[in-house]
């Protein structure tokens, strides 16, 4: 996985996760999807970032920043900023 790859932590049943993945696809962003229901380390990371909650999507960017349950516009703005 490239150092420039975005990591999306989510679940298969999460509508907001599917929406975020669509936005990433529309922006042709490189990302790695991790289902927290099948990855204990990923679930622990999401809980750590979200103070014990399993809030998804939790999106980790190459610059180290994290967005949790971002709106479509917030995610699009972040992607635009990364592509500068």
Regions found by a protein language model. Give the residues of each.
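Non-catalytic, surface beta->alpha helical segment in thiol-disulfide oxidoreductase systems
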Residues: 61-84
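Short amphipathic alpha-helix with an adjacent loop that forms part of the alpha/beta core around
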Residues: 46-50, 79-82
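Thiol-based oxidoreductase modules, predominantly thioredoxin-like and allied folds used
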Residues: 29-43
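Short alpha-helical
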Residues: 15, 41, 74
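Structural micro-motif
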Residues: 50-60
């Amino acid at each position: 996985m490239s150092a420039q790859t975005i990591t999306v932590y989510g679940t298969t049943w999460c509508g907001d996760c599917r929406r975020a993945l669509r936005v990433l696809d529309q922006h042709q962003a490189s990302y790695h999807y991790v289902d927290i229901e099948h990855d204990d380390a990923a679930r622990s990371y999401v809980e750590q970032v979200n103070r014990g909650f399993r809030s998804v999507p939790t999106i980790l960017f190459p610059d180290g920043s994290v967005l949790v349950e971002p709106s479509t516009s917030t995610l699009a703005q972040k992607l635009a900023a990364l592509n500068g």
